[in-house]
């Protein structure tokens, strides 16, 4: 008998979600069973974990399982588990409300592709609502483990914006979800249909899924039988597991709709015994760049589920990796805090990191096309590697890909090994330029002398690149050198001598330019790096790069004031023209315009763009 029954309205976001789920996934209805079984599996995991420290939660029933029963007469399917169960408050919170941000993300991710969208509901933790794809009414009976039978609850909704909830005595813990099927969905009253769906989506669930046995005539008996493999797949040897099994397990733990690119499954024995199963996804998750987004591996200890998103087993730059760690020697009551300072965890972390990098190296060597797909999805994250993982810096460096002046494309496809193999005779540095965009890098005046001499330059336009080159300053003994900082020395003694001679001849001009620019520059020098442009700005060798300064300023950070060096091309017609200008005001106009032009060409911003436009207009009129 139901007592203290209340009618409540769904949160606005839940109404939206219900509408979206039911109407966007109607042609892929069978996924409701996958989602409800997955939720039941989670409930069993949670109970077993909590029972490690409080055995009374088992209530003398430690035979954990998921049960599915069909009632053709009542047109219902009931999915029940003897897991952790729900209290009144948890039922209202979990079945009546969801995070607003989650709704917005869900809506933005919908594509109209049934296969893809069906996976999103699991990814966003709203799989329960898939029940309304096939049912016009859903009844949930539940009691949280440890509460009294009188604390059982019954929750019911027709998916129309409201739900009722009340207390109802329930002698057993756990949750029982009854779907009252819509008439057009009677196909799901077929025992064989349900078994087929379980085999397709949930065979790898490590808890037994039981249904009533069928006689040879196809009639139900009172006995139950397990209809899935009910094995912790990762505990088996590789030879016992099919490729499709690996893929299905990946989809279960990741809520991904695509197959993984590759995986690595290892049983480690010795001082520490553990199993790892690591997957490299085929595409980036929607929240890859959200700082608060959950990531990490599933942790088991002796086959007992301990926690999701155990971040301690991989560095942050590998946060896209999905998988499982099953350790034999960790304590069952281990907490996230204990994981931080555990020697065995450090050992497993080091091994997992090397395993992932090894998988990537193998892919990059043996299957360049697949590796390029990986890089297009995750390359930006991998570039964080040398910054935070000094021990594996060299291994990560081999995996990096870049755009270059030789590739002629914005696609990042060139490895550092390829670059080094193409270096000119006598070249001892790897040259690069950083900019705010690929086009800004590709068209930088700093490239002029390198193009003339046929020297390849890395074009770096990702924000992380500035930090990357700060931490990775050499590769296989070759120093990485910015072409927009300090002097450029390309081993051309004749040009250097010519510059020295010109410096003597043009000393009065250089002094005059310095007096005009005054505090805006650190120095004015003749350059050998330009062939087509009249001037450029560069950072001093010891100063922060100009692009890094812009990034930090945009982030609102205080940075030390550093002025650029203004370099002029003595062979350019505009610089030669400066010789002939006698009027100081005209000279100042020309010099200021050339300087600001160089700042813009470098990707910088002017304090007063209107002044620049006005100056250019005045010079056009007077020329």
UniProtKB/Swiss-Prot annotation:
Cellular localisation: Cytoplasm
Region (B) residue spans: 337-550
Region (C): 551-623
Gene3D superfamilies: 3.30.230.80, 3.40.50.11260, Heat shock protein 90, C-terminal domain (1.20.120.790), Histidine kinase-like ATPase, C-terminal domain (3.30.565.10)
PROSITE patterns: HSP90
Known role: Molecular chaperone. Has ATPase activity.
Protein name: Chaperone protein HtpG
């Amino acid at each position: 008998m139901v007592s203290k029954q209340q009618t409540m309205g769904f949160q606005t976001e839940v109404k939206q979600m219900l509408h979206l789920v039911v109407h966007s996934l109607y042609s892929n209805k069978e996924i409701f069973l996958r989602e409800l079984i997955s939720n039941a599996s989670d409930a069993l995991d949670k109970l077993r974990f909590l029972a490690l420290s409080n055995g009374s939660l088992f209530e003398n029933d430690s035979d954990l399982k998921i049960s599915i029963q069909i009632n053709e007469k009542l047109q219902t399917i009931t999915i029940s588990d003897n897991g952790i169960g729900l209290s009144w408050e948890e039922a209202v919170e979990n079945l009546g409300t969801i995070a607003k941000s989650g709704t917005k993300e869900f809506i933005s991710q919908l594509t109209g592709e049934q296969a893809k969208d069906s996976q999103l509901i699991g990814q966003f933790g709203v799989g329960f609502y898939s029940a309304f794809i096939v049912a016009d009414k859903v009844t949930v009976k539940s009691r949280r483990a440890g509460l009294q039978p009188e604390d059982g609850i019954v929750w019911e909704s027709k998916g129309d914006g409201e739900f009722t909830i009340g207390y109802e005595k329930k002698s057993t813990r756990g949750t029982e979800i009854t779907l009252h099927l819509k008439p057009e969905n009677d196909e799901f009253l077929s025992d064989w249909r349900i078994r087929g769906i379980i085999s397709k989506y949930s065979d790898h669930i490590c808890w037994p899924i039981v249904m009533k046995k069928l006689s040879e005539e196809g009639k139900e008996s009172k006995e139950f039988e397990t209809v899935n493999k009910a094995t912790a797949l990762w505990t088996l040897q590789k030879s016992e597991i099919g490729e499709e099994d690996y893929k299905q397990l990946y989809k279960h733990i990741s809520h991904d709709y695509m197959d993984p690119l590759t995986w690595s499954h290892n049983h480690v024995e010795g001082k520490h015994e553990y199993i790892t199963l690591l997957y490299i996804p085929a595409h980036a998750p929607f929240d890859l760049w959200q700082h608060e987004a959950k990531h990490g591996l599933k942790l088991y200890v002796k086959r007992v589920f301990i926690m999701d998103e155990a971040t301690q087993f991989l560095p942050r730059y590998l946060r896209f990796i999905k998988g499982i760690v099953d350790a034999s020697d960790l304590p069952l009551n281990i907490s996230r805090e204990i994981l931080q300072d555990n020697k065995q965890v450090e050992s497993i972390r080091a091994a997992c990191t090397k395993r992932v990098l090894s998988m990537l190296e193998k892919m990059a060597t043996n299957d360049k096309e697949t590796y390029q797909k990986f890089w297009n999805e995750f390359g930006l994250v991998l570039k964080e590697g040398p910054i935070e993982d000094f021990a594996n810096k060299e291994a990560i460096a081999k995996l990096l890909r870049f755009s270059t002046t030789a590739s002629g494309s914005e696609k990042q496809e060139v490895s550092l090994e390829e670059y080094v193999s193409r270096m000119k005779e006598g070249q001892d540095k790897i040259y690069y330029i950083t900019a705010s965009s690929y086009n800004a890098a590709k068209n930088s005046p700093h490239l002029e002398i390198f193009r003339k001499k046929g020297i390849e330059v890395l074009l770096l336009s990702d924000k992380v690149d500035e930090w990357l080159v700060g931490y990775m300053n050499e590769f296989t003994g070759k120093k990485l050198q910015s072409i927009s900082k300090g002097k450029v020395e390309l081993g051309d003694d004749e040009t250097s001598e010519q510059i020295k001679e010109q410096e003597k001849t043009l000393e009065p001009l250089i002094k005059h330019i310095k007096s005009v620019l005054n505090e805006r520059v650190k120095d004015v020098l003749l350059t050998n790096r330009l062939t087509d442009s009249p001037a450029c700005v560069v950072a001093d060798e010891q100063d922060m790069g100009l692009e890094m300064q812009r990034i930090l300023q945009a982030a609102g950070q205080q940075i030390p004031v550093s002025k650029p060096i203004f370099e002029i091309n003595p062979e350019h017609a505009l610089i030669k023209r400066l010789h002939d200008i006698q009027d100081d005001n005209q000279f100042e106009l020309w010099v200021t315009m050339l300087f600001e032009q160089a700042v813009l060409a470098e990707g910088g911003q002017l304090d007063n763009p209107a002044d620049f436009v006005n100056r250019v207009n005045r010079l056009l009129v007077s020329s």
